[in-house]
Swiss-Prot record:
Signal peptide: none annotated. Keywords: Cell membrane, Membrane, Transmembrane, Transmembrane helix. One of its GO terms (cellular component) is plasma membrane. It is a multi-pass membrane protein. The lineage of its organism: Eukaryota, Viridiplantae, Streptophyta, Embryophyta, Tracheophyta. It is found in: Cell membrane. It comes from the Eukaryota. Homodimer and heterodimers. This is CASP-like protein 1. Belongs to the Casparian strip membrane proteins (CASP) family. The chain crosses the membrane at residues 31-51, 74-94, 121-141.
């Protein structure tokens, strides 16, 4: 998403000139939110990896860490899902436009930018599915440690 930037010559009707206009992810708050949400999720995954490694050295803290990880993982899943939805909505308007609001599609002009956008959203969807699977794994691990 961050590397998606494209400059094209856009024709203006009067007089018949073309002006360069660039499109980048900072043009949309939804794209900025997408980058910020996945940056936070990436930083959190690094921190949890380090803490999980430390928990292997001191097994007494493992139950507490897993329970905290499950809660924060679910919160991050909500943030990541909202970011994917916001970026996907703006991307869809860029792809198809909106005739009711008279927003024209831009992906026929900024094709490389839209390809970067689509790739980022697809990678984000895959990452969110992996996050759901990891949350389920953490939940089942935690439920096995609860005495019956």
């Amino acid at each position: 998403m961050v590397t998606g930037k494209q400059t094209e010559l856009i024709p203006i009707p009067f007089p018949p000139y073309q002006i360069p206009y660039s499109s980048k992810f900072t043009d949309s708050p939804a794209f900025i939110y997408f980058v910020a949400a996945f940056s936070v999720a990436g930083l959190y995954s690094i921190i949890t990896s380090l803490l999980s490694g430390l928990a292997l050295l001191k097994p007494g803290y493992a139950k507490q860490l897993v329970s905290h990880f499950v809660v924060v993982d679910v919160l991050l899943l909500g943030i990541v899902a909202a970011a994917i939805g916001a970026a996907g909505g703006v991307g869809y308007i860029g792809l198809r436009g909106n005739s009711h609001s008279r927003w024209t599609k831009i992906c026929n002009i900024y094709d490389t930018f839209c390809q970067h956008l689509a790739g980022s959203i697809a990678a984000g969807l895959i990452a969110s599915i992996v996050l759901v699977l990891l949350i389920l794994l953490s939940f089942f691990t935690l439920s096995r440690k609860i005495p019956k």
